[in-house]
Amino acid sequence: MTCAVFTKRYEDPRRAAAAGAHREWLARLECDVRVPALRSAQPHQLVFEHLGHQRPGPTDLDVLAQALGRMHAAAYTGQLHAARLDEPSPGPHGLVIRDFVTPRRDALDRMPLPVAALPAAFYKDANIRNFLLTGEGVAIVDFDDLTLAPFGYDLAKLVISTAMTHGRLDPHEVEQALITYNTHTAQPDVDTACSPEQLRVYAEFHHQLTARYLHRNGYHHAWPDVRPWREPEVAR
């Protein structure tokens, strides 16, 4: 019996190697979130275990927030408790997780975020299309991006990508997703909670980075048209 696989191709072999290393790091979190097995790695392609086609939708926001919270809590406990958001974080097997600031410097110049002193989680691009629902729970796919990020930042990407894909979200469901996320990221010795205001500001920051993809990559709705709250006042 031949197992189904998914092949992702890369023009740049460095991108392929980085994605493979990111997948390995995420798989080692062991937090009851499925990570597809890497069947083979070549300079220009990665071949993954195929985990099906069941895509989540807006009604799955809470279960996705729970999975994201478990991943961030496991990463903080295992490695990122010692990380700073403005410095790269060395990991096992030579992996270095990029800092939050450097790859976003232009966007931060336009919209400063005072995050350097906050505890570190990570960003792996929690676009709703980068999750699958399986018989064994939530799975994550697409390992191209991995940087440090404040707690709640990747949850904001989940919110904005879901709204831009499916339309306006129920504000109460977004609120519940944040509560669920904070419940699963809670630490005994540091405040990792993302406030509703922080979530809104992070979403506006993501809007800077995703607006150019409107009507591409599954984004059918402009964020200002589907924002599930009033536009927050943010520092410019």
Where are these regions (language model features)?
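Active-site activation/catalytic loop segments of kinase-like enzymes and analogous catalytic loops
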Residues: 155-189, 203-222
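Regulatory N- and C-terminal appendages and interdomain linkers associated
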Residues: 227-236
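A conserved alpha-helical element in kinase catalytic cores
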Residues: 3-42, 46-47, 52-74
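A general structural signal marking secondary-structure boundaries and capping sites
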Residues: 30, 68, 72-79, 112, ...
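Catalytic cores of nucleotide-enabled group-transfer and carboxylate-activating enzymes in metabolic
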Residues: 11-13, 42-46, 52, 76-77, ...
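Active-site acidic catalytic loop and adjacent metal/ATP-binding pocket
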Residues: 1-2, 110-153
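Conserved kinase catalytic-core helix
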Residues: 53-87, 101, 105-106, 111-112
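Amphipathic alpha-helical protein-interaction segments enriched in hydrophobic
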Residues: 194-206
